[in-house]
Amino acid sequence: MSVSEQDPNRAYRETQSQIYKLQETLLNSARTKNKQEEGQESNTHSFPEQYMHYQNGRNSAYDLPNVSSQSVLAFTEKHYPNKLKNLGTLYYNRFKEGSFDEDSTSYSDRHSFPYNLYDNTLPPPFLPAIGIQNINNIATLKITYEDIQASFNNIESPRKRNNEIWGCDIYSDDSDPILVLRHCGFKIGAPSGGSFHKLRRTPVNVTNQDNVTGNLPLLEGTPFDLEVELLFLPTLQKYPSVKRFDITSREWGSEATVIHDGLSYGIYSIVIKQRLDRDKPHEPNGYIKNLKWT
């Protein structure tokens, strides 16, 4: 029996080692640049306020810290040459872990009694465990306007309150998907007179880093829902802390912590779906809440 047959994960670990070395080069480049800008006071990359807001329909030009993950994405595509397979659909919930199973309660039961079934303080990460065999595959995530609004307003949104987000462009799989969307530049309303051509709201899509279909409502408070494709990626040795779009992600992988024990993911595509009846709560027929209650 060959060594690879004895240890089927050996090839994966060898590939991971190469990814770690490649990522360290990118992190060192970003780290050197940011130390100059921050006086070595923090390992958090702070972007200028002007970058996070539109003024007269334009983005101000600044020499921003380079945290591009394109080399890691190209390496992943080379070593995991899967034809993108959709693993299924998940329905976002602020309080429980998602599941690809079909035998779950309906969306209308989300806030039914007893409320104590929810962990309103420290819910588990939303994304379920994804095996390494699914690296470079995608999953569809459906998010309602109410959940998006709760995150932006920090109301009944424990993952926002706990700032559960690690990394930049590529995030640990226990990062909250809505926080990841916000960290990539997604906003709840279209900027007045603004242009999206410089945004990178789908940074792990190597062919289109702003792969967004549909338009955000111009009228504030107009409800819409999202269908987001998540691309699963290998574990990174380190997830950097970066401040962007009013969200500061957290670092994981410093000397004081162990390597993350799950996969990574990023935003691959976004579909914006405006509701036809703005006053009607989002409870379409067949909308299934796939959740684990244990």
Curated annotation (Swiss-Prot):
InterPro entries listed in its UniProt record = Rxt3
The entry's localization annotation reads: Nucleus
Highest taxon of source:
Eukaryota
Q: Which Pfam families match?
A: Rxt3 (PF08642)
Q: Which residues carry this modification: N-acetylserine?
A: 2
Where the protein is mainly located, per its record? nucleus
Quote a single Gene Ontology cellular component term: nucleus
UniProt keyword Transcription regulation, yes or no: yes
Keyword list (alphabetical) reads: Acetylation, Chromatin regulator, Nucleus, Repressor, Transcription, Transcription regulation
Q: Name one GO biological process term.
A: regulation of transcription by RNA polymerase II
- The keyword Transport is annotated on this UniProt entry: no
What does the record's miscellaneous section state?
Answer: Present with 3060 molecules/cell in log phase SD medium.
Assembly and partners are described as: Component of the RPD3C(L) complex composed of at least ASH1, CTI6, DEP1, PHO23, RPD3, RXT2, RXT3, SAP30, SDS3, SIN3, UME1 and UME6.
Task: Name the job this protein performs.
Answer: Component of the RPD3C(L) histone deacetylase complex (HDAC) responsible for the deacetylation of lysine residues on the N-terminal part of the core histones (H2A, H2B, H3 and H4). Histone deacetylation gives a tag for epigenetic repression and plays an important role in transcriptional regulation, cell cycle progression and developmental events.
Q: Which family does it belong to?
A: Belongs to the RXT3 family.
Protein name from the UniProt record: Transcriptional regulatory protein RXT3
This chain's source organism reads Saccharomyces cerevisiae (strain ATCC 204508 / S288c) (Baker's yeast)
Gene assigned in the entry: RXT3
